[in-house]
Amino acid sequence: MTGLALVTGASSGIGREYARRLAAQGVSLIAVGRRRERLDELAAEFPEVIVRPVVADLATRDGIEQVVAAVADQPVTMLVNNAGVAHYRAFAELPPEQAAELVGVKVLAPTLLTRAITPGMIARGGGRIVNVSGMIAFSGPASLEQVPLRRAVYAASLAHSVALSQTLHAELSPHGIHVQALCPGVVATEFHERQGMDLSAAPRMSAADVVTASLRGFELGETVTAPGVEQNDLLQRVFDADLAAFGGQSPQLATRYRS
């Protein structure tokens, strides 16, 4: 495999593993993260591959614009929108700056970075885009007894990744561009520890397995890849229900709402 991949959140976890996997296959990298020393270590690990470190905070508009400038006129063949942050707090107690950080990193940054590289992919006739989401994107209907995490903004931001991926895939697949929402469960990385959460007792998947599933998901033609879901028809039933609800609408007021 050759080409140029833009990987965000490449300092650790899934992003670092994805960057390492691609570099091992000869793919050049634009590696984005907030920790310069981690990005330099990544570059030193693959001296035979071009690895361009970009230190940027994607929670800020300046950080996003910095990365957009870094990829301007670059022939990006793959984008991995992996950068993430999680703030599990009761909604009424979530500091506004943390809510803004979540939306910036998981909604605004992936949207604008994808917008930046899409015209080039269309012109070149193909590409791959990965939006790293999570199974918690599907947890909206769950009660706090079922899922005790206070997660409203976080779950909503990941649900955005799924919807963006599905609708973009429909729009861009005629141009040879495959868009994938990658939805793991709990992963054995630094991610939750850096948010002050101890999930050491929880069953966790390795970042390596998550990346393996993503790459295999492209081969299988999946738009939503869930590494830990054995029965793929479970997800298909969710999507079929979405389409049934969308198709079941009418301009007439539903009977249950009539007095």
Regions found by a protein language model. Give the residues of each.
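Conserved glycine-rich cofactor-binding loop
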Residues: 11-12
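Conserved NAD(P)H cofactor-binding loop of Rossmann-fold oxidoreductase domains
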Residues: 82-88
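Conserved glycine-rich Rossmann-like NAD(P)H-binding loop of the short-chain dehydrogenase/reductase
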Residues: 25-41
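Substrate-binding pocket helix/loop in short-chain dehydrogenase/reductase
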Residues: 90-92, 98-101
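A short, exposed helix-loop element centered on a Lys and neighboring polar residues
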Residues: 114-115, 166
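Catalytic loop of short-chain dehydrogenase/reductase
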Residues: 130-160, 166, 170-173
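C-terminal helical subdomain
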Residues: 181, 197-237
